[in-house]
Amino acid sequence: MNSVTISHAPYTITYHDDWEPVMSQLVEFYNEVASWLLRDETSPIPDKFFIQLKQPLRNKRVCVCGIDPYPKDGTGVPFESPNFTKKSIKEIASSISRLTGVIDYKGYNLNIIDGVIPWNYYLSCKLGETKSHAIYWDKISKLLLQHITKHVSVLYCLGKTDFSNIRAKLESPVTTIVGYHPAARDHQFEKDRSFEIINVLLELDNKTPINWAQGFIY
């Protein structure tokens, strides 16, 4: 692990070597906007903003990307809910349960699955207000997701409205699926078969499919 010092909280970013090519730009962009976004109480807390940068990228095949953290109780790990109360991760777990037949589980975490990096496009929001920090993170968000897509085969974005123009923001060619948000109305996410489709796409690319059942916590 490497670390770099920044002028504002969290003051230090610890990161895996795979993120090195974007770190100097990240530090520059963050120092420009940090004083604005830190005026708010945030979800997650600043110490958790950059926690996913500890993840290597070279062993990842899929990025599962949400728009921003939970408006309360964000952990810095996208979709993570230690007490398994958040609708998004419960819906994701139900979808994987239908796909895999696993039913007796107490939780689900995308961050423990081989080959998968869960990501949030914006790394924080004002406590209780989703997408409230979009304007501050925009340059950083584009920089970091762009970097991730250089390593993965499939980018799966959850939210048809939020990610409607995501392909235009990315320069590297990556297979992109834009699916329904897990909290979408009318049970649209239930009918979405993206997790299956991702594995078909990986096989077509001669990559190992994802074992989605690995995310279950018992």
From Swiss-Prot:
EC number in record: 3.2.2.27
Presence of the UniProt keyword Nuclease in the record: no
Family of this protein: Belongs to the uracil-DNA glycosylase (UDG) superfamily. UNG family.
Function: Plays an essential role in viral replication as a component of the DNA polymerase processivity factor. Excises uracil residues from the DNA which can arise as a result of misincorporation of dUMP residues by DNA polymerase or due to deamination of cytosine.
Keywords: DNA damage, DNA repair, DNA-binding, Hydrolase
Catalytic activity, reaction form: Hydrolyzes single-stranded DNA or mismatched double-stranded DNA and polynucleotides, releasing free uracil
CDD domains: UDG_F1_VAVC_D4-like
GO MF entries: DNA binding; hydrolase activity, hydrolyzing N-glycosyl compounds
Keyword Isomerase among UniProt keywords: no
InterPro entries for the chain: Ura-DNA_Glyclase_AS (IPR018085), Uracil-DNA_glycosylase-like_sf (IPR036895)
GO biological process, one term: DNA repair
Enzyme class: hydrolase
Binding partners and assembly: Homodimer. Interacts with protein OPG148. Component of the Uracil-DNA glycosylase(UDG)-OPG148-polymerase complex; OPG148 and UDG form a heterodimeric processivity factor that associates with OPG71 to form the processive polymerase holoenzyme.
PROSITE patterns: U_DNA_GLYCOSYLASE (PS00130)
Native source organism of the sequence: Monkeypox virus
Protein name per Swiss-Prot or TrEMBL: Uracil-DNA glycosylase
